[in-house]
Amino acid sequence: PAAPTTADATPTAAGEAPGHNADAPFPPEDSYISFIPQEGKEGQEFYKYERLILQMIVRYGEKVMCNVTNEEGQEIPVSVIEYVVSDLKQDELSFHNPLHRQILTEAAAHIHDAGFTAERYFLAYPDPAISKLSVELISNRYQLSKYHSKSQKIVTDEERLYELVPALMINFKYAIVSEELKHMMSALQDPAIANDEEKCNAIMKRYSEMREVQSIMAKRLGDRVVLP
């Protein structure tokens, strides 16, 4: 399976969480600045992975996908929701669709509630846009996992969360960063931005950071789980 990313940009063993910090506050869903236009996003490669990750969150969000050792040497279970939040925050990335960001923020806020089940929570969510999307994500029982070739046993996605979720995250991050870089270059050619030194420098700094993320993800893709 593809190795998750760590905060210092070195691979961890599969099954470890990326710079996991359960107490880290999750940023508000409207704080993410993207250069990718909302229009036409559904046709983009990153959007396919974004939706698959969201499907994992709504279906299996509270499920433990791996353990991580804390500073005291204790094994701490990490849920799908915690893993996704931590992995995105590490590179200051987020989902592109505002509704998807809202769902992830809600999931992160309630993951430690007693008896929390992502599927039940989002199906009963008062905002009809969220509950409707949740129905779509849950009712479409599309499996990324295939038959095991030797035993013909069906391996479920839930049994492979420890490898599927990191692989989806690597594919998503590479795709969305590549798209952001393209639109950043266009933004820098806009005279209004090119003539504003502060804006220009801020974009150039972020561009440099994203190029580094892109490079790391490109290396990880060489060892990825094959996904459709």
Feature names for model-found ranges:
Residues 2-122, 132-154, 166, 170, ...:
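Non-catalytic protein-protein interaction segments used by genome-maintenance enzymes to assemble
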